[in-house]
Regions:
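Nucleotidyltransferase catalytic core that binds NTPs
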Residues: 1-179, 185-198
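Long, charged alpha-helical interface segments
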Residues: 145, 205-206
Length: 206
């Protein structure tokens, strides 16, 4: 549901056996793994949508993505009724959207953001990294390099969001294989663009 017509649903990396072993090693008792037809009947026509938070960043180029994310996550919460749910900070916009959804709809669950986990060379871990060949994998390191540059500029006292994001873009653009969708400084809660690097702020890029 959160995948668009030309996106990678069919080829998205899945390894249930590996996931199950990791869960078992972590002490998990039960894995919830429904079939698509169990979650979405032929008559399914109800969706969760949101204004504002889903129109910036990834929402501009993937207009139905967050509607799908919110719908499937809310269904999961209703079925499983968890006390806590964990979402990676790597997708900061998704985390903000889910937090807003559970607040607005009075869902009794605590949303916890999990820090980004990186490979030894700095690349953020992601199931989609398997799509990269050796050359692309090496080129992708420019992303973590841009993050470090932004952090250094902010630590050195640069307060202008435009100055920091411009410097990050210029670094990424030096990598021939890189294609920038956006590099933006936004409020971490509202996902609205900001002009100053003042908390709560994050720089999102794709």
């Amino acid at each position: 549901m959160q995948f668009g017509p030309k996106e990678d649903l069919a080829s998205y990396p899945r390894d249930l056996d590996k996931d199950a072993k990791l869960c078992e090693a972590a002490g998990v008792d039960v894995i919830f793994h429904p079939e698509p037809e169990e979650m979405y009947t032929p008559q399914f026509c109800s969706y969760v949508d949101m204004n504002g938070l889903t129109t910036e960043l990834c929402g501009k180029t993937r207009p139905t993505h967050f509607r799908g994310v919110q719908t499937v996550v809310l269904k999961l919460f209703h079925i499983v009724t968890p006390d806590r749910a964990y979402f990676g900070q790597k997708d900061a916009q998704q985390l903000a959207v889910i937090k807003r959804m559970v607040t607005d709809l009075n869902v009794d669950v605590q949303i916890i953001g999990c820090p980004i986990i990186r490979e030894e060379d700095g690349l953020a871990k992601s199931s989609r990294n398997t799509y990269l060949n050796a050359e692309e994998r090496k080129a992708a390191l420019v992303l973590s390099q841009a993050v470090k540059l932004g952090q250094k500029l902010a630590a050195d006292g640069e307060a202008s969001a435009d100055a920091i994001t411009t410097a990050m873009k210029e670094l990424i653009e030096k990598e021939p294989l890189a294609r920038i969708d956006y590099v933006k400084a936004v409020d971490a809660v509202s996902v609205e663009p900001v002009s100053k690097m003042q908390p709560p702020v994050l720089v999102a890029m794709a």
